[in-house]
A protein has these predicted regions:
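N-terminal first-folded block
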Residues: 1-32, 36-37, 41
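Short, well-ordered beta-strand segments in beta-rich or mixed alpha/beta enzyme
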Residues: 2-8, 40-67
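Short phosphate-engaging motifs
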Residues: 15, 49, 72
Length: 95
């Protein structure tokens, strides 16, 4: 399983509501994709500009397919990425 945590920071506080709406929409679509084990989006209660994505994919292939899918290419990439600073952290789940 591949685990990915993505830290997002809104560049402009005026875009927080828009980012939140786009991330919610992308999350719902991503959860329906083959190989998606977990896909959650969190909005910080203490840092309003901060969002955290937690993704678990069955395989690298599933993640690669996600990056070709609608949620990533029609919502996340064009509508969210230009509005945020982004830091991805691939990780291994400890057992």
């Amino acid at each position: 399983m591949l685990c990915l945590t993505v830290l997002l920071l809104a560049k402009d506080p005026a875009h927080i509501k828009e980012i939140r709406e786009h991330l919610s929409q992308a999350m719902r679509k991503s959860r329906a994709e083959p190989g998606c084990v977990r896909f959650e989006v969190y909005h910080s209660q203490t840092e309003p500009r901060r969002f955290v994505l937690v993704e678990h994919w069955a395989s690298q292939e599933a993640l690669d397919q996600h990056r070709l899918a609608e949620a990533y290419n029609t919502i996340y990439k064009p509508m969210v990425m230009p509005l945020v600073e982004r830091e991805g952290h691939p990780a291994t789940l400890l057992e």
